[in-house]
Amino acid sequence: MSDITTLSLTALRDKLARKELSAVEAASACLARIEATEPKIHALLHCDAEAALAAAKALDAAGPNPDQRLWGVPVLVKDAICVKDAPTTCGSKILENFTPFYDASCIEKMRAAGAVILGKANMDEFAMGSSTENSAYKVTANPWDLGKVPGGSSGGSAAAVAAGQCFAALGTDTGGSIRQPAAFCGTVGIKPTYGRVSRYGLVAYGSSLDQIGPLTRTADDAAAVLGVIAGPDPKDSTCAPRDVPDFEAALAGAADLAGLTIGLPDEYWGEGVDAEVRDACRAAVDTAKSLGANVVPVSLPHTPYAVATYYIVAMAEASSNLARFDGVRYGYRAPEAQSLEELYELSRSKGFGPEVQRRIVIGAYVLSAGYYDAYYRKAAQVRRLIRQDFLNAFEKCDVICGPTSPFAAFTIGQMSDDPLQMYLSDIFTISLNLAGLPGLSMPVGLGTTSAMPIGMQLFGRAFDEATILRTAKVLGNALPPLPQPAAV
């Protein structure tokens, strides 16, 4: 791996500002890394080297600009986020020929901040999956072990950051799709508070759950990117009209956790968590104590109902959102269709993969007459109870902590035939989306059995991303750094 591509985003930014590196050199290093690693990990669906180098040359011609906080930084974007003139497929055949004519709001902000967009990252189809095996185009491998999954649905973004293909990647998180792949690939991934980042230009899966966020190498890097993409947006009515704090300033000089109270929910530390995961996360909590944090027990009693609640709500919203893909206006159109009815039926049955079809059918069922009250309405009520659990817990602590996933990255194909087991892999991440609160996954070591990265999750109060970022920075600096992934 090039010395350049092993740098953190903030370290690269400093070198660019001092003109020790040019934007073209940074982009070229990442493109070379993509060329070397992509045949192994298959993290990307689209890479436009020509456009990236042209953008980097334009930046170099203008010179470093301190007002552009990502000046010259090469980044990748999950393929559910619209990038003008770049294919945006959502990992689905039904959108195989779709090219947006506009940038998503977060992409506009990234460009304005000087970021160089290299391409689009692979993902589970329409963000429905936990392994990136559901992509219609390729299966992404974990850079730590090419036989293991990178997690999902933002697996391409996580794998690309871990492999040094970019310095940051945007992902989306509907039920853990940033945090779980971050845990599996040994990166930092943050899901902001619902409404912190505009969803304009994001192809929707579950509109009340989806959030865009960064995957990076360090908490400082995540703070830098989040500070750019966050903020109000008149094009998204669900985007909160709140000022964005200076996340980087909030992290500056952070050296200990004195005065911080961390809550440990019993429901996240019991049976069902692999011993290597529990041990690594417990050791990280002990380190937090040594840094001055106070640790207290808390309870999130409705956690056992979270998986069922999430999948009812998410599938209902998906069935509604994906009704627009019909072969008429854009996307895949079945050429053999002889009638309008056949056009709808064949385009959707051939354009959508099996997992997406499963979720659409279940979602339509729970919304149908006679079943709405039995399923969707009850799920909405339990969702409110889950949120209240967090509000009650945060009366006793500042941050809630637990494993990101019950296990480390699993073998490709291991859960493909058991969708219910795959759904359970999100058991510790989905509650936060139902509650609309911010969460971050950070690496805390390698598993003693699997030798794969272990991720620990930090939950924060609404719009208090700064506290979990600061906690992750201080704790991350105190823990032994992970080595570079050996498989690439």
UniProtKB/Swiss-Prot annotation:
Cellular component terms per the entry's GO annotation: glutamyl-tRNA(Gln) amidotransferase complex
Keywords annotated in UniProt: ATP-binding, Ligase, Nucleotide-binding, Protein biosynthesis
Active site (catalytic residues): 78 (charge relay system), 153 (charge relay system), 177 (acyl-ester intermediate)
Keyword field contains Isomerase: no
Similarity annotation: Belongs to the amidase family. GatA subfamily.
Role summary: Allows the formation of correctly charged Gln-tRNA(Gln) through the transamidation of misacylated Glu-tRNA(Gln) in organisms which lack glutaminyl-tRNA synthetase. The reaction takes place in the presence of glutamine and ATP through an activated gamma-phospho-Glu-tRNA(Gln).
The protein, known as: Glutamyl-tRNA(Gln) amidotransferase subunit A
Native source species: Solidesulfovibrio magneticus (strain ATCC 700980 / DSM 13731 / RS-1)
Name of the gene: gatA
